[in-house]
Amino acid sequence: MKPAVIVLHGPTSAGKSSLARALQDIAPVPAFHVALDAFVTMSRRRDMRSPEEVQQAYHLHCENLRSVLARVVDSQFEILVDLVLRDESELQNTLRVLSGRPMYLVGVQAPVEVLEERESHREDRGGGMAREQSTNPAFRRNYDLVIDTSTHSPEGGAIAIRNFVREHPRHGNPSGNAA
């Protein structure tokens, strides 16, 4: 059986990337960290001249993410997916690509004040994104597990996720939360 997919889903500045790196550090097998942000940085939003261009770039980023995930899913690596997707159809399409593996959907959250504080220290984030995203219904779903990064360090969150995966083994297709 191939290793699991752990999907880290939450608003900007919640700590998904830090959590993914901590998960890699204690992974039982080599783990790929695939983040939507890696594709988003291929374009600069300020260069977009219309809402249509922004939307076209967003869909291209999501398609590129799914294309890479489709290749990695055929490997023997564990997959750590770092997503801020709010569009339900894009999220479901992405999860569907991963559906041949045991999958765990982990909500990564923190109080809005913590998100805003973290956001203020990031050069790659505009102000207000954390507040807007924290109230989005996309992040109020039934997750397999929720990690509050205001009360868990990345290492502590990674241990909690690893314990959950070990205590709730899955084979093949994901839970009803995923695809």
Task: Give the predicted meaning of each segment.
Residues R118-R162, E167-A179:
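Small-molecule kinase domains that catalyze NTP-dependent phosphoryl transfer to phosphate-bearing small molecules
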Residues R21-N64:
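Conserved substrate/cofactor phosphate-moiety recognition/catalytic segment
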Residues S13:
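Walker A (P-loop) phosphate-binding loop of P-loop NTPases
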Residues A57-P102, Q109:
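Glycine-rich phosphate-binding loop used to anchor ATP phosphates in small-molecule kinases
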Residues L8:
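Hydrophobic anchor at the beta1->P-loop junction of P-loop NTPases
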Residues K16:
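Conserved lysine of the Walker
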Residues K2-V5, F77:
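Pre-Walker A (Motif I) flank of P-loop NTPase domains
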Residues S99-S120, I147:
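Conserved phosphate-donor/acceptor-positioning beta-strand/loop module used by diverse small-molecule
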